Regions:
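Short, glycine/charged-enriched secondary-structure capping and boundary segments
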Residues: 11-13, 30-34, 64-67, 114-115, ...
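Short clusters of hydrophobic/aromatic residues that line enzyme substrate/ligand-binding pockets
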Residues: 6, 67, 90
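Residue-level detector of flexible, active-site-proximal loop/helix-junction positions
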Residues: 2-3, 56, 74, 106, ...
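N-terminal beta1-alpha1 cap of cysteine-dependent amidohydrolase-like domains
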Residues: 1-47, 162-197
Length: 197
């Protein structure tokens, strides 16, 4: 979408996944405005939508939530999360999990009607739902450890030595439960498309 390529018709696809981005949801790019409009149109058609990182923040902002800087600055690495709600569509039920993330902004106020289902010390609204067709999360279930180190390498110019040292430590700590989150995303989409006989 950053190259201004959008589906010609909302009905072209059964559902939509909004990924991460190197830009901020507050940046003044026309494609961000177009994507925001697209979110509204897809929601009006009750399309299942998943937002990840940038997508998570943009969806919150579109529906009236607030996105702002994390007081601790860059949060890079693998961090523990509390799972507050296990929805019926989640095939695997857990109370805690870990996930990689790479960002310095976060959702600081949820849109009206949104329900938070995962949080951490630094992210009270790490993951949330809106209605029964939108699920959003701050972290990156699609990224393995090596990708996180690659991200760190290409962004070193904008990071302090302290940020880099902390990131290296956090990326290497523990084991990300990315498979659990990836499965949840598939479970969510699957709940909207039951198997055909």
């Amino acid at each position: 979408v950053s190259e201004y390529e959008f589906p010609n018709n909302i009905e072209s696809y059964d559902g939509y996944l909004l990924t991460g981005s190197p830009v901020s949801v507050h940046d003044d790019y026309d494609w961000i405005k177009m994507l925001s409009d697209f979110i509204g149109k897809a929601n009006n058609k009750n399309k299942p939508i998943v937002g990840v990182c940038f997508g998570h923040q943009l969806i919150a902002k579109y529906f009236g939530g607030v996105v702002g800087n994390n007081e601790k600055g860059w949060m890079i690495g693998n961090f523990p999360l509390e799972i507050e709600i296990n929805f019926p569509w989640m095939k695997k039920k857990v109370n805690t999990t870990d996930l990689y993330h790479f960002n310095k902004e976060r959702v600081i106020k949820l849109p009206e009607g949104a329900i938070s289902f995962a949080s951490s010390e630094d992210y009270p609204y790490y993951a949330y739902t809106i209605g029964d067709n939108i699920v959003c999360l701050q972290g990156h279930p699609e990224q393995p450890k090596r990708a996180m180190y690659n991200f760190l390498e290409v962004t070193k110019a904008v990071l302090s030595e302290k940020d880099i040292e902390k990131a290296n430590s956090c990326i290497g700590s523990g084991k990300s439960n990315s498979v659990v989150w990836a499965q949840w995303i598939m479970d969510f989409f699957g709940s909207h498309f039951p198997p055909k006989n």
